Design a protein with these regions (language model features):
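C-terminal subregions of glycosyltransferases and related glycan-biosynthesis enzymes
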Residues: 1, 15, 175, 180, ...
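Nucleotide-sugar donor-binding/catalytic module of glycosyltransferases
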Residues: 1-215, 220
Length: 304
C-alpha cells in the first residue's frame, strides 16, 4: 500500500457511522495529499468511502481485541511498512485542512506533535474553542511530569515520528492507551510540539468513553480509578525494567495516592461528598482526561 512517508490511522467501530462522513470530508479537504490512510474496522462493516484523493487501505479485525491492542496493530503496521510518521485520528471527529501538513512539517523536528482541540456536539456545533489552551496545555511537552496526574494527549489530535519508538509495547490490560504511549515517549526523552493553528473537532457524545470535562458520577469515578491504577502499575513495571529510578519514585507515590482514595471511597457517605466537591469545582480543577480523579490530599484543598 505505501506511497507516502506518513500514515494517518483511523479506527472504525460500531457507532461512528453517523459521523464518518465529516471525517472523510476532512481527509479529502486536506491541503496536502502526501499521506496514506489506514482504516482498522473493529468488528464492523467496511464504510463506503466514496472517491478519495489519497491512498487508502482497510484491515478487518474480526477478533475480540481491546481498543489498546487494535491501536497496537495500527502502530505495528506503520512500523513494519517503514513509515516515518504516524498521525492518529478518530472517525467520529474531524479536523482543519492544515492538520496533516503542519503535523508532517513539525515531525521533521519533534518526536511527537499535538494540535489544538475544539469541542463539538453530536450535530457538529462548536461547544468550546481552543480547549487545550484554556486548560493550560497550550505549550510544548517535554517531561513526563506534565502528564503525571492526567492526560491531554489523545489519539484524535496527535502524531508521532516513528523513529522515536524503540522497543515499544502496549500492555494488554491498559485502558488509556494514549496516556501510556506518550508517557513512555516522554520517559525516553521525547519532545512534543504544540500546534496551535491546526484544529481537531472533538465530538462529545453520550457514547464517548471519556470526553472532556464530563460531570463525575459513581461509574465514571470507578472507571477513572481503574484507569489510573492500571496506568501507574504498568508504568512502575516499565520503570523497574528500565532503571528509571526518579520516575519510579514519582509513579509509586501516585499509585499509593490512588490506593488510599480507593479505600476511602468504600465509605458511601464520603464517596458522595467526594463526587459533590469534584463537580462543584470542576471548572477550576479540570485540566485533562482523568484530572478529576484527585488524590485525597489534593481533594481536601477544594473541600476545605
Amino acid at each position: 500500500m505505501k506511497k507516502s512517508k506518513t500514515l494517518v490511522l483511523g479506527v472504525n467501530y460500531k457507532g461512528v457511522e453517523n459521523y464518518a462522513k465529516d471525517y472523510f470530508k476532512s481527509i479529502v479537504d486536506q491541503d496536502t495529499d502526501q499521506f496514506d490512510l489506514l482504516i482498522l474496522n473493529d468488528n464492523t462493516a467496511s464504510l463506503k468511502l466514496g472517491e478519495m484523493n489519497v491512498n487508502v487501505d482497510e484491515i478487518m479485525i474480526s477478533e475480540d481485541k481491546s481498543p489498546a491492542l487494535i491501536r497496537y496493530d495500527g502502530l505495528n503496521y506503520a512500523i513494519s511498512n517503514n513509515y516515518q510518521n504516524l498521525i492518529f485520528s478518530d472517525l467520529d471527529d474531524f479536523f482543519s485542512i492544515n492538520r496533516i501538513s503542519l503535523s508532517i512539517r513539525e515531525l521533521e523536528k519533534y518526536d511527537f506533535v499535538f494540535n489544538e482541540i475544539h469541542l463539538i456536539d453530536q450535530n457538529s456545533e462548536i461547544i468550546d474553542e481552543n480547549y487545550l489552551y484554556k486548560i493550560c496545555l497550550g505549550k510544548n511537552v517535554n517531561s513526563f511530569y506534565q502528564i503525571l496526574d492526567y492526560n491531554c494527549l489523545g489519539l484524535t489530535h496527535t502524531g508521532i515520528n516513528l523513529e522515536s519508538i524503540k522497543n515499544f509495547y502496549i500492555p494488554e490490560n491498559i485502558i488509556a492507551v494514549d496516556w501510556w504511549l506518550f508517557t513512555i515517549l516522554l520517559l525516553n526523552g521525547a519532545n512534543g510540539k504544540y500546534i496551535d493553528n491546526a484544529i481537531t473537532y472533538y465530538r462529545q457524545t453520550d457514547e464517548n468513553l471519556v470526553g472532556m470535562k464530563k460531570i463525575l458520577n459513581e461509574n465514571r469515578l470507578k472507571t477513572g480509578i481503574r484507569v489510573k491504577q492500571t496506568h501507574y502499575d504498568n508504568i512502575i513495571k516499565y520503570c523497574n525494567q528500565n532503571n528509571l529510578e526518579i520516575a519510579l519514585n514519582s509513579y509509586a507515590l501516585k499509585k499509593d495516592g490512588i490506593l488510599e482514595l480507593k479505600l476511602a471511597l468504600k465509605d458511601l457517605d464520603f464517596q458522595k461528598r467526594y463526587i459533590d466537591i469534584i463537580n462543584s469545582n470542576l471548572d477550576d480543577l479540570y485540566c485533562g482526561w482523568w484530572s478529576e480523579i484527585l488524590d485525597l490530599k489534593t481533594w481536601r484543598t477544594y473541600a476545605n
